[in-house]
Amino acid sequence: LSEDALRIMRSYRFMDQGAAGIWWPERHLADALRTTKPMLKRIARERIWSEFKRILLGQQASEIVQRMADDGILKEILDLDWEQDDVRIKLLNELEGSDVIDRLVVLLRDFSSKDCEQLAAKLRLSGQEKKRLLFRHAKLGHLPEDTESTMRVFAVVMGTWGEQHLCIEKMFARDGPSLDYTEDDVQQRLDRYLRLNIDVNVEPLASGEYIMQQTNIPQGPKLGALKSWLFYEQVARNLRTIDEIDTLLCTLSWQSEDTSRWPKLQFP
């Protein structure tokens, strides 16, 4: 181990034998893994992330990652503190799909967005990986209201990640009694989300050109704010045609110069 610190990470990865279960190392190797962990500092961060990704996606991820936490390896590579029988780690095995960022998001649920940024830098995540991590992490702990219009807005803001977000919230609601919502609360929203069958890739019906023609608002921040407001209403009300937008425009008080309170697509 002392010659190749990357073997430390590979040893943990090898413990996960997939369908064959877990191979726990004998005591001599287990002690060596714990005592040589400072050597992980010598390895290129990208290589550590490459190994850690494979561990996170393993069939026995919860058991292996908890062992890494108990052995001090997780603290060494992520510079964050972990609990014994950590709920976040326990939930890794229950997560559907093979998106490794979802697994990081679950692990980092109780840490700050600053911690996530530092971890992204520490593990040298790609720009896309970092963007997905920060976006998803910011949504955790928030539930949309259980109404059709709010759920439509939620779905379009979240894109293809809406259902997975609710599934993750459901897991934490079941295992985290301190939350102010229950597993049933999340399930109701999940049922509504799936029932509505929302097109998350919907585009604004009203272009900037169209709004300028209808309102004589010149190009600038106010035009952008009105376009955002119209798109919000289009999604929330499930409008399908430009005629419906036309009718809507007659009912909105868009003449005021203060656009700070105008709705726009966002969650939370």
Which residues does each predicted region cover?
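Glycine- and charge-enriched loop/helix tracts that form the active or gating conduit
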Residues: 1-123, 221, 226, 231-234, ...
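Charged substrate- and nucleic-acid-binding regions of tRNA-handling and nucleotidyl-transfer enzymes
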Residues: 13, 176-268
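Residue-level detector of short coil/turn "hinge" positions at structural boundaries
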Residues: 24, 75, 127, 144, ...
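A diffuse structural propensity rather than consistent per-protein peaks
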Residues: 25-26, 44, 146-152, 182, ...
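Short acidic/polar alpha-helix capping motifs at helix-coil junctions
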Residues: 28-31, 171-177, 193-194
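Short, mixed-charge aromatic SLiMs
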Residues: 32-45, 92-93, 120-136, 142, ...
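Short Gly/charged-rich anion-binding patches and loops
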Residues: 63, 115, 132, 206-207
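Divalent metal-dependent catalytic cores for phosphoryl transfer on phosphate-bearing substrates
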Residues: 83-182
